[in-house]
Amino acid sequence: MKKNIRHFLLLSALAAGSIHLLNRFIQAAADMKNILKAENGNYYDWKNGKIYYTKRGNGSPLLLIHDLDPVSSSYEWCKVIRKLEKNHTVYTLDLIGCGRSDKPFLTYTNYLYVQLITDFIRNDIGEKTAVLTSNESVSFTVLACNMNKDLMSSILVLNPASLKSLHITTNKYASVKKTLFELPIIGTFLYNLRVSNTSLNKAFREDYYARPQLISSKLMDAYYEAAHMNFSRGKYLMASMEANYTKNSIEHAVKKLEVPFYLILSRNGKDAIANADTYTRLNSSIETVYLSNCKKYPQLEVPDKVVETVNQFLQNN
């Protein structure tokens, strides 16, 4: 009996060691190309960690907030920044838990991001700003604006998450998944499987782009690198997202919005028209525009159309 226990413990230790080495190899491979260079920007010392950001151009302030996803970063805006900065002082940031920002071991809640956006605009930008945001990040952007009337001059959203998807709450099963992802070795391994090159390639081809032939290897490498920076600690954000802690209903906030609110949607996206209708039914002042030949991230697939649409909206408001 004791011999069997020793064999089991030995095999368990060998398995754990092998998985740990595999995790470290994945980390090293992801960092090898160093596409996301931190020296190109600055760090905002926030209460929960250092937040990577950039500031470029001159003119009225415009803050770009990438989609809330462990694979995302401000690199999401790489194809539109140079053109937007011709007319605006453009700020980008890597949300906490993403990209080059710190990825602390904590529960990432929707309100955490409300606080981050509020503090960054007040302490670093220092004046009312227009905000261009993407997908899941619509929730905390709208809530931050609703809670602080002097924060934003206008909001533009690329393919906002559906109101129904934001109304999901956590449960026991989701909490178990959160705990699994937070485990030191096996949790990192599970996370690495979820953000593998194969998984990212599938996401880009099926969800992110309408025309897969436009996907560049450098773009894929940047997303892969973002997911694995800081020893794959993006798993803590993923753990909280799996448990729906980053979700929050925004219907009440959408109804009360007093700043110009503009939805930019992809015709090739799933349920784009129906999604827009749920927003406009709550607030008739919301404006919408549809872009063709793109899916989830038009800022990457049709950047010129996005820049033209954003500039036109900001000039009119």
Regions found by a protein language model. Give the residues of each.
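Active-site loop/oxyanion-hole signature of alpha/beta-hydrolase fold enzymes
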Residues: T92-L132, E308
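Catalytic active-site module of serine/aspartate enzymes centered on a nucleophile-bearing elbow/loop
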Residues: S284-N317
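Conserved loop-alpha-helix segment in the C-terminal half of the alpha/beta-hydrolase fold
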Residues: K256-C294
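Conserved HGGG/HGGXW glycine-rich cap/lid loop of the alpha/beta-hydrolase fold
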Residues: T54-R100
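Conserved alpha/beta-hydrolase catalytic His-Asp/Glu region
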Residues: L193-A253
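Hydrophobic alpha-helical topogenic segments used for membrane insertion/localization
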Residues: K2-I26
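A short loop-to-beta-strand scaffold at the N-terminal edge of the catalytic core in hydrolase folds
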Residues: W46-R56
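Conserved hydrolase catalytic core segment
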Residues: G126-T170
